């Protein structure tokens, strides 16, 4: 079974950032080879439209057959608002709440990000999962790309 990995904008952008490039590039290469399924959202696609050309080329290198796109639908919006209402994230970070909610509602295997303040943050992960369980959703795994690479 191939892992379905929701990938936020920071990971694709990380391919062009010296600090994050090694693990971001390796993960994207796994998507290109079809070893993992790249799960994006319509929100991620919108955010990437404003990214540098080099970042957009990284995404374009992944065959469409290896990509799944999830929608920011009413279910995800409602779940994101529940994270905000519970104080897990402030309202000004609604886009981050949307990423978590889309991945949760889409029941991905893991969400990867380099956003340590609002996403890959133990206290917030506990908050997201507390809301998820109260709302009848499964807990969400949130990791960095380094933690999900095949040979790490």
Predicted regions: what they are:
Residues 41, 113-114, 145:
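Generic beta-sheet signal
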Residues 1-40, 46-61, 67, 85-91, ...:
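Short, well-structured N-terminal submotif of metal-dependent ribonuclease cores
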Residues 58-61, 71-72, 144:
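Extended, non-globular alpha-helical segments
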Residues 68-127, 149:
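Active-site neighborhoods of divalent-metal-dependent phosphate/nucleic-acid chemistry enzymes
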Residues 39, 70, 141-143:
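General small-molecule cofactor/ligand-binding pocket signal
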Residues 122-141, 145:
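C-terminal end-helix/capping segment
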Residues 34, 112, 138:
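Residue-level signal for beta-strand positions within conserved beta-sheet cores that form or flank
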């Amino acid at each position: 079974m191939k892992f379905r990995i929701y990938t936020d904008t920071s990971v694709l952008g990380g391919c062009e950032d010296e600090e994050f490039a090694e693990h971001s590039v390796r993960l994207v290469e796994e998507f290109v080879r079809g070893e993992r399924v790249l799960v994006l959202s319509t929100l991620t696609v919108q955010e990437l439209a404003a990214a540098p050309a080099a970042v957009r080329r990284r995404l374009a290198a992944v065959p469409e057959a290896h990509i799944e796109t999830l929608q920011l639908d009413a279910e995800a919006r409602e779940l994101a608002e529940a994270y905000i209402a519970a104080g897990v994230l402030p309202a000004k970070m609604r886009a981050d709440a949307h990423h978590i909610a889309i991945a949760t509602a889409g029941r991905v295997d893991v969400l990867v990000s380099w956003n340590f303040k609002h996403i890959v943050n133990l206290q917030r992960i506990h908050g997201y999962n507390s809301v998820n369980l109260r709302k009848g959703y499964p807990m969400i795994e949130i990791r960095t790309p380094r933690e999900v690479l095949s040979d790490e």
